[in-house]
């Protein structure tokens, strides 16, 4: 029995949360496995991909949420994602939780070079992938900043203090993990109550290709005149009983 399961019932994973994680394939890892992540693996699929234990995933997510909620100033928590698919998720997470965020390439010296223009000293660092965010993790280790990381089955855990085992390569999986993490932080702070579902849609945490969004917008704009033209040929009933008019 895990620490979360043996503790308060409030923090236990609900069936609806488990269904969300399964639907977004948060439990499907890679075909590779690092020795440090072996304890989080439940089994393998027929295709050879490793399956992550949902209970251990939830336990670490709750632990990470408690750490973030305990930081007095939310801006002292820095969320990073060098992986493109995670930029939208960390932006929405920071928007709701109030943390600082850094998307795209991490500039060397951000945590260690005090004369740098964008120098910051966060109290907690959250990263999307220990591999792509290795520079941020390395600098955090030099200045004693605790690190929370979304870790796939092949992730290295060097300098990672809290590893949340999950699929950190899928667009929907990354969005779901940050959505759940944001929700739990807000619940622990008392900003939202557990008895009422969070109104924020998880879809807003999913990365969208700018080109795809522009194409959809252009298609909608092109379809609008055609729809208006069709409406113009409708029939309107007159007040008198003699006829109909176009």
Curated annotation (Swiss-Prot):
Required for the assembly and/or stability of the 40S ribosomal subunit. Required for the processing of the 20S rRNA-precursor to mature 18S rRNA in a late step of the maturation of 40S ribosomal subunits. GO terms for biological process: ribosomal small subunit assembly; translation. One of its GO terms (cellular component) is cytosolic small ribosomal subunit. InterPro entries: Ribosomal_uS2, Ribosomal_uS2_CS, Ribosomal_uS2_euk, Ribosomal_uS2_euk/arc, Ribosomal_uS2_flav_dom_sf. Belongs to the universal ribosomal protein uS2 family. It is found in: Cytoplasm. Keywords: Cytoplasm, Ribonucleoprotein, Ribosomal protein. This is Small ribosomal subunit protein uS2. Component of the small ribosomal subunit. Mature ribosomes consist of a small (40S) and a large (60S) subunit. The 40S subunit contains about 33 different proteins and 1 molecule of RNA (18S). The 60S subunit contains about 49 different proteins and 3 molecules of RNA (25S, 5.8S and 5S). Interacts with ribosomal protein S21. It comes from Leishmania infantum. GO terms for molecular function: structural constituent of ribosome.
